[in-house]
């Protein structure tokens, strides 16, 4: 006799021990429903025999072994106790993801096992003795939460997969298709699914009845209330403790466990159920999703192919059960079969299906909050830093061994190099000191020479003006004092070079002096140095340096002054600005446009030398012309009359 299934062991004991080790197999419980009244009327007999609490005889040569086998005489309370759902609830409170789903042929009692019989009428409650696994789990869970010290938040969602479309059974409006998404943190999830928070058993029962009333049901030959969709009711348990805090990221799911109840639609043969039209389309969709689920289970059984790609995306059902089948959850499968001989082929198919499923293993892991993850992260970082410290210490020891022979030479070389740099800096500092001293001496010499030349220029200018005065007066003539004469208009030509003992008069025109300098462009100094009065000027005839410039278009200024003239005039202007000229100096010249600024300090010494030489030549030529010309008569001019230009 061929025996298939799990090895010997007690299901309750294995569930009470919890998920030990890296992998935990899917727990499978088999329930055989009683013979229906229709089957008894047709005279059909039971072909299944339970030999013990874990073995089912499917024929003379076939036997299947599961975690628990429940015959037709077992009640709903016996099923709840044998399945170990309480242990799953405890794991969910500790943060694990737990799933309970039923599987079997249509009409085998899957919905009855989970939710009990359908209500006989509106407002008529189901008898407590007939309540299914879901109602009993809800009552136990809420009673358990009341005795916990820490606050617990309970929420619920309810959906169905009908013709490969996910519909929300708790939506406020009419159910509409919802998309199934995936991310790294949550895995597969339904977007925009309504999650309702509850705090009492009555509120949760109301949510369950609302979902059951919206679920698609139809009648066919084998079942008068056949479910035409897969239904998933999920309880989210968020328990806050001192070591576990709620998630602060709104994009992540709440930290805590969940308990999911999955009522799969039964597989069916269209020929046996007599489905036509829409019922046949629903049957095809149900069979296709169950086939995808069986294919994923077969691939998960192969150790080599389990590490490869598992096609969970082939169906919406396999997407939502991916975490329960091959992920981080704890899964319980309740296989329901019919004992009738008419359903024996489908019953054997269900038994083989459940036998393969209990060999699938998962890796249960409770999600950790950021606070709970911190010690593990710190420990990992500490190990990495210790490893890096050992590696760097080893490299440092190797470098010390290699550099031990070169340490003495490096120190000596560094000392010699430092001494040489200090010597170079000292020599450079001394050279800069000497250069600075030489530059200061050159500056002082240039300033002294400039001062001497300026004094010589001043003296020569005074001599020039004095010579011009004596030449105009003639020898032996003393002009009368203007104080005894009629008043004359004041002179604006020159500052007072010489003055009368009782008043200040101009030595050239013999009129009282009004101020020190003439206004530019108003009065012109008479020509006293040029004896020629002809129409054309000789090339050597130039106006005195202190004369103001005339307009370029006038007859008195036929040409512009040369650059050398303006250079000499600029030197006189700078001396007047620096207050190095005696009060008897000529008035300030007007600076011509577009003239480069003169050099100051030592740069102006050559110009002063040139001016000194020019003044000497001018004084000599003036004295020679004075000797060659006869003196002018006394009556030729009056004391207040200005000499005409020659």
UniProtKB/Swiss-Prot annotation:
Residues 540-551, 584-595 have a biased composition (Pro residues). Keywords: ATP-binding, Coiled coil, Cytoplasm, Cytoskeleton, Disease variant, Intrahepatic cholestasis, Microtubule, Motor protein, Nucleotide-binding, Phosphoprotein. The modification Phosphoserine is found at residues 6, 14, 369, 638. ATP binds at residues 104-111. SMART domains: KISc (SM00129). Residues 25-360 form the Kinesin motor domain. Residues 1-13 have a biased composition (Basic and acidic residues). Residues 1-25, 529-565, 579-646 are annotated as: Disordered. Residues 372-467 form a coiled coil. One of its GO terms (molecular function) is microtubule motor activity. GO terms for biological process: microtubule-based movement. It is found in: Cytoplasm, Cytoskeleton. Changing residue 337 to M: In PFIC8; uncertain significance. One of its GO terms (cellular component) is microtubule. Expressed in fetal liver, adult brain and pancreatic islet as well as in kidney tumors, uterus cancer and pancreatic cancer. PROSITE patterns: KINESIN_MOTOR_1, KINESIN_MOTOR_2. CDD domains: KISc. Its main location: cytoplasm. InterPro entries: Kinesin-like_fam, Kinesin_motor_CS, Kinesin_motor_dom, Kinesin_motor_dom_sf, P-loop_NTPase. It is linked to Cholestasis, progressive familial intrahepatic, 8: An autosomal recessive form of progressive cholestasis, a disorder characterized by early onset of cholestasis that progresses to hepatic fibrosis, cirrhosis, and end-stage liver disease. PFIC8 onset is in early infancy. Belongs to the TRAFAC class myosin-kinesin ATPase superfamily. Kinesin family. This is Kinesin-like protein KIF12.
